Amino acid sequence: MASLDRVKVLVLGDSGVGKSSLVHLLCQNQVLGNPSWTVGCSVDVRLHEYREGTPEEKTYYTELWDVGGSVGSASSVKSTRAVFYNAVNGIILVHDLTNKKSSQNLYRWSLEALNRDLQPMGVLVTNGDYDREQFADNQIPLLVIGTKLDQIPEAKRNEVLTRTAFLAEDFNAEEINLDCTNTRCLAAGSSNAVKLSRFFDKVIEKRYPREGNLIPGFSDRKRFGGGNFKSLHYD
C-alpha cells in the first residue's frame, strides 16, 4: 500500500473537558471506557476520505494531537508544551458545555498555539471578551467542539447552546456539540459528521493546496511549517 499523505491537527482545551474521549471516538468510532488524564501529548490517527464520493477522493492520515495540561500553567510548562505546536495544519478547540470557564479559556488556548512565540496581549477571558485583532491573521483552520451535551437538562439546553454559539463566530469556525458516550452523534450523513468532514477537507486543502481549492484569505504562515502514529504518548 502506498504511503499516505498526512496532516497534523491539535486538540486543545482544559483538562477534564473530554479531549481524550473525543479523540478516541473520532479515531476508533468507539466510546472510551476509562479515560485518564493526558500527560504531555497523546497522538492517535483517523483515516479521512478527502472529498469522499467525488473524482478527487483521496485517503489521508489525520493525526490528532491531544495536548494535556492547563492553560493557566506556569511558563515553564507552557514552554515545554510549545514543542507540540510545530507544523500544525488545523486546531480543534474543545470545551465542556457544562463548564463556562472552559469555554472562555478557548481564547487563551488558541492564542498559546497560534502565537506561541509571542506574549498574548489585550485578551480578557473573565467575561468572554477578547481582542479580535489577535485572530485577524490566523491562517489555520479551526473547529469548535462542545462536549457533555448529554449532561445538560433538556429544559436548559437551548439556553446553554445559545450562550456558547458566539465561540464559533469569534473563531470564524464551525461548531459541533456532542455526547462522547454516544457513537451515533457522528453517524454518517449527520450534520455533525458533515461539519467534521468539511473541517478536515479544509485542513488538507491548506496543507496540500490545489488550484481553485485555496481557502479564501489564507496564505503561507511561516511560523507553522508543513507517518503513521497510533496511540503514541509524549511525556
UniProtKB/Swiss-Prot annotation:
What superkingdom heads the lineage?
Answer: Eukaryota
Please name the Pfam families in this protein's record: Roc
Alphabetized GO MF terms: GTP binding; protein homodimerization activity
Query: Signal sequence span per UniProt?
Result: none
Q: Which CDD domains match?
A: RabL3
What the entry lists under InterPro entries is as follows: P-loop_NTPase (IPR027417)
Q: Which residues bind GTP?
A: 16-21, 148-150, 179-180
Which SUPFAM superfamilies does this chain map to?
P-loop containing nucleoside triphosphate hydrolases
Q: Which GO terms describe its biological process?
A: B cell differentiation; natural killer cell differentiation; regulation of protein lipidation; regulation of Ras protein signal transduction; T cell differentiation in thymus
Alphabetical UniProt keywords? GTP-binding, Nucleotide-binding
Against PROSITE patterns, the record matches this protein to:
RAB
Q: Where is this region: Small GTPase-like?
A: 1-235
Protein purpose: Required for KRAS signaling regulation and modulation of cell proliferation. Regulator of KRAS prenylation, and probably prenylation of other small GTPases. Required for lymphocyte development and function. Not required for myeloid cell development.
Q: Which family does it belong to?
A: Belongs to the small GTPase superfamily. Rab family.
Assembly behavior: Homodimer.
> What is the protein name stated in its UniProt record?
Rab-like protein 3
Q: Which organism is it from?
A: Xenopus laevis (African clawed frog)
